[in-house]
From Swiss-Prot:
Main location: plastid
Subunit structure: F-type ATPases have 2 components, CF(1) - the catalytic core - and CF(0) - the membrane proton channel. CF(1) has five subunits: alpha(3), beta(3), gamma(1), delta(1), epsilon(1). CF(0) has four main subunits: a(1), b(1), b'(1) and c(9-12).
Bilayer topology term: Peripheral membrane protein
PROSITE patterns: ATPASE_ALPHA_BETA (PS00152)
Annotated protein name in UniProt: ATP synthase subunit beta, chloroplastic
This protein's record includes keyword ATP-binding: yes
The organism of origin for this protein: Ipomoea setosa
Keywords (A to Z) from UniProt: ATP synthesis, ATP-binding, CF(1), Chloroplast, Hydrogen ion transport, Ion transport, Membrane, Nucleotide-binding, Plastid, Thylakoid, Translocase, Transport
GO process annotations (BP): proton motive force-driven mitochondrial ATP synthesis
Name of the coding gene: atpB
InterPro entries registered for this protein in UniProt: AAA+_ATPase, ATP-synt_VA_C, ATP_synth_F1_bsu, ATPase_a/bsu_AS, ATPase_alpha/beta_chains, ATPase_F1/V1/A1_a/bsu_N, ATPase_F1/V1/A1_a/bsu_N_sf, ATPase_F1/V1/A1_a/bsu_nucl-bd
Organism classification: Eukaryota, Viridiplantae, Streptophyta, Embryophyta, Tracheophyta
Domain of life: Eukaryota
Subcellular location as annotated: Plastid, Chloroplast thylakoid membrane
């Protein structure tokens, strides 16, 4: 792990004023800066614009192109309002560096690693540059292992890979935020791990709502901030494209420190990976590059790869990434989502139909997929159980039109039995969440994989055909369902 001892690129006081340039051109968030001969900054170096006189401007930019004639082209990480030609620019001599370590937990940062939550400065001297190479092959942990989440529907039907990448698909109001918070809570309790949330180009209101909900559910501990389980990094919709393009790397850098130095399992959330591509497209156009297919940047695959390849398992720890994927106009062949899919190990699809039925988490058991669901990885027992659950639910789905028109009585005895078991399975896939206790009043449940498999095997075998289906709704393991059935009878 390469640690850079300098402070954040925006803090001019810590930078030796040895390499000065001047702004010669400003086009929106893009600046052209002239430097003395032989003093050209490197690509990705952070430049800081100095205000004139006593003005505190401190706009940080990142070098993107060397133009010749001792000029560089840089992209600003904040608004360029008030900047003028002739202003002094300092080359910090290093990429943007952000604070890392335990003191980042419970705090909100911007792309430069500056806290934006009005809780004062971050208590750390350890910073790390946001541009780093992916781990070498020899450092990687190539063993395929399941990342147990304690959420039945995920662990059984679309299991996550330790150090893998998961795409999270779902519209507004189907429970994305609650699922994300439950995963943050469970990784802290079951794996002793931490989480980093990168808000990339989404609404400021949503970022604020997430922060308040995390405080309410205890994921962020207001009384004792260092006891929190998550660090938040935001680069929202209103920020320049440079900030939105780099905020994902800031979040990833914080996650890498927990993996490489603290040797922890880390969950990295990116919401939304499409906005990362969109920001890169804007920057590419501003830099004058020829657009590629559908107007995207010609470097789309390279940019996506440089982010995704750093998200992996090493011999020290793992970064498991869950990425919300916006699909523009529901076109899965659009270059942005299509490039993302190439990197994903699993997809978790949230269904509005299940949410309308009150089944939470509203994960669609038939649409969600995982490359890990293979007998040689999860074992024959897990694989067979998952396949039988999917077959039962698929048959129920096929019969729903007949049931709607003719009713249950017109079905064969075998199909009626399938429908009854499918309805029990559908309800047993629901689960009370720890982070939702404050809303539901039901205590949260973490269900181990072995318990999950046992429960579904009992339903499929027909041993529980005599129990009412409401006994399976919002319970943890199968023993709770049988106990609930006894209570319903009395």
């Amino acid at each position: 792990m390469r640690i850079n001892p300098t402070t954040s690129g925006s803090e001019v006081s810590a930078v030796e004023k040895k390499n000065l340039g001047r702004i010669v051109k400003i086009i929106g968030p893009v600046l052209d800066v002239a430097f003395p001969p032989g003093k050209m900054p490197n690509i990705y170096n952070a430049l800081v614009v100095q205000g004139r006189g006593n003005e505190q401007t401190n706009v940080t930019c990142e070098v993107q192109q060397l133009l010749g004639n001792n000029r560089v082209r840089a992209v600003a990480m904040s608004d360029t309002d008030g900047l003028m030609r002739g202003m002094e620019v300092i080359d910090t001599g290093a990429p943007i560096s952000v604070p890392v370590g335990g003191s980042t937990l419970g705090r909100i940062f911007n792309v430069l690693g500056q806290p934006v939550d009005n809780l004062g400065p971050v208590d750390t001297n350890t910073t790390s540059p946001i541009h780093r190479s992916a781990p070498a092959f020899i450092q990687l942990d190539t063993k395929l292992s399941i990342f147990e989440t304690g959420i039945k529907v995920v662990d059984l039907l679309a299991p996550y890979r330790r150090g893998g990448k998961i795409g999270l698909f779902g519209g507004a109001g189907v429970g994305k935020t609650v699922l994300i918070m439950e995963l943050i809570n469970n990784i802290a309790k079951a794996h002793g791990g931490v989480s980093v949330f990168g808000g990339v180009g989404e609404r400021t209101r949503e970022g604020n709502d997430l922060y308040l909900e995390m405080k309410e559910s205890g994921v962020i501990n207001e009384e004792n901030i260092p006891e929190s389980k998550v660090a938040l990094v935001y680069g929202q919709m209103n920020e320049p494209p440079g900030a939105r393009m780099r905020v994902g790397l800031t979040a990833l850098t914080m996650a890498e420190y927990f993996r490489d130095v603290n040797e922890q399992d880390v969950l990295l959330f990116i919401d939304n990976i499409f906005r990362f591509v969109q920001a890169g497209s804007e920057v590419s156009a501003l830099l004058g590059r020829m657009p590629s297919a559908v107007g995207y940047q010609p470097t789309l695959s390279t940019e996506m790869g440089s982010l995704q390849e750093r998200i992996t398992s090493t011999k020290e720890g793992s970064i498991t990434s869950i990425q919300a994927v916006y699909v523009p106009a529901d076109d899965l062949t659009d270059p942005a989502p299509a490039t993302t899919f190439a990197h994903l190990d699993a997809t978790t699809v949230l269904s509005r139909g299940l949410a309308a039925k009150g089944i939470y988490p509203a994960v669609d058991p038939l649409d969600s997929t995982s490359t890990m669901l293979q007998p040689r990885i999860v074992g024959e027992e897990h694989y067979e159980t998952a396949q039988r659950v999917k077959q039962t639910l698929q048959r129920y789905k096929e019969l729903q039109d007949i049931i709607a028109i003719l009713g249950l009585d017109e079905l064969s005895e075998e199909d009626r039995l399938t429908v009854a078991r499918a309805r029990k399975i559908e309800r047993f896939l629901s689960q009370p969440f720890f982070v939702a206790e404050v809303f539901t009043g039901s205590p949260g449940k973490y269900v181990g994989l072995a318990e999950t498999i046992r429960g579904f095997q009992l339903i499929l075998s027909g041993e529980l055909d005599g129990l009412p289906e409401q006994a399976f709704y919002l319970v943890g393991n199968i023993d709770e369902a049988t106990a609930k059935a006894m209570n319903l009878k009395t």
